[in-house]
């Protein structure tokens, strides 16, 4: 064996020893049934997710456009094609229209989500209100959220549909939950590392104290603000490092942000998209 081959084999063996990152695919705002829904974008996203083989797929709401049963059935038909044993889904404001939350519960179960796996804790809540666009977590849920995060974990994730922080280009009103400040304080006390949300179709990332808030765009509709494109997030959680990518169906990915959970040092990509930047 020549030295180069030996070195390559040694490097390969060393690489195989390293623990693989825990991968989360984060999609949002499918809006099945909308006139702006693009089936081939959702088809492609499903194919890409199955090729990615994530450990968890998270869907942060607005599966439907008006909360109708046929829209839920359409959304579910796509989500059922995703080959991942851990699928966490929370409803959005569109899903709560026309008493749509009853169909959500019939097809997806509880409107709250919990997963404790591989040192990771993920807790999701329903922030929607029936027939209203604004959202709230609600004081009655704070104790429950705290209880779910008491389990020992290396990395904690909170998921909901609405924003807890403003996102550029999303305008006023309805983008943040009414009790954003209170729930942020709860999450800070729980030592949550990351918040995942959707709602206004603008992908973005913020750091607030020790928490990183990451918003997803719409994965498969043309309800787009400015120059934003359909996309979803891919999150890689490794040894004291978290890297978040924005993936465009049929196209490449852009780095959004990379951070160290223990020091909260971070590097934000210039490619972070806003409605005024293409």
Residues covered by each model-derived region:
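A short C-terminal boundary segment appended to hydrolase-like catalytic domains
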Residues: 1-9, 18, 238-278
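N-terminal active-site segment of His-dependent metallophosphoesterases
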Residues: 1-78
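Extended active-site neighborhood of metal-dependent phosphoesterases/phosphodiesterases
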Residues: 3-11, 15-16, 69-147, 182-188, ...
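Beta-strand-turn-beta hairpins that frame and shape the catalytic cleft
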Residues: 15-25, 114-124, 150-155, 207-212
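Active-site neighborhood of phospho(di)ester-bond hydrolases with catalytic His/Asp-centered motifs
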Residues: 26-28, 56-62, 87-93, 126, ...
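Active-site environment of divalent metal-dependent phosphoester hydrolases
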Residues: 32-36, 65-70, 74, 93-101, ...
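Short acidic, glycine-rich surface-loop motifs adjacent to enzyme active sites
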Residues: 152-169
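Conserved beta-sheet core of the metallophosphoesterase superfamily
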Residues: 172-243
């Amino acid at each position: 064996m020549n030295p180069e081959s030996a070195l390559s084999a040694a490097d390969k063996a060393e690489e195989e020893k390293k623990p693989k990152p825990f991968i989360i695919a984060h999609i949002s705002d499918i809006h099945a049934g909308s006139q702006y829904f693009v089936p081939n974008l959702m088809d492609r996203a499903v194919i890409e997710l199955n090729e990615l083989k994530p450990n968890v797929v998270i869907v942060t709401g607005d599966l439907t456009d008006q909360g109708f049963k046929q829209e839920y059935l359409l959304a579910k038909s796509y989500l059922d094609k995703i080959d991942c044993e851990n699928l966490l889904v929370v409803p959005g404001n569109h899903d709560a229209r026309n008493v749509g939350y009853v169909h959500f519960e019939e097809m997806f179960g509880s409107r709250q989500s919990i997963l404790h796996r591989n040192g990771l804790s993920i807790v999701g809540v329903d922030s929607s209100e029936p027939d209203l666009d604004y959202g709230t977590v609600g004081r009655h849920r704070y104790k429950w959220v705290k209880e779910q995060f008491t389990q020992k974990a290396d990395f904690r994730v909170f998921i909901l549909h609405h924003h807890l922080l403003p996102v550029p280009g999303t305008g006023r009103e309805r983008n943040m939950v009414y009790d954003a400040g209170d729930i942020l304080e709860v999450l800070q006390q729980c030592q949550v590392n990351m918040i995942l949300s959707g709602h206004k179709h603008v992908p973005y990332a913020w750091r607030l104290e020790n928490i990183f808030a990451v918003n997803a765009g719409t994965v498969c509709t043309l309800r787009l603000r400015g120059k934003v494109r359909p996309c979803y997030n891919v999150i890689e959680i490794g040894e004291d490092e978290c890297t978040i990518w924005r993936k465009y169906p049929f196209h490449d990915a852009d780095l959004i942000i990379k951070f160290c959970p223990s020091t909260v040092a971070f590097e934000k990509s210039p490619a972070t998209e806003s409605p005024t930047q293409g």
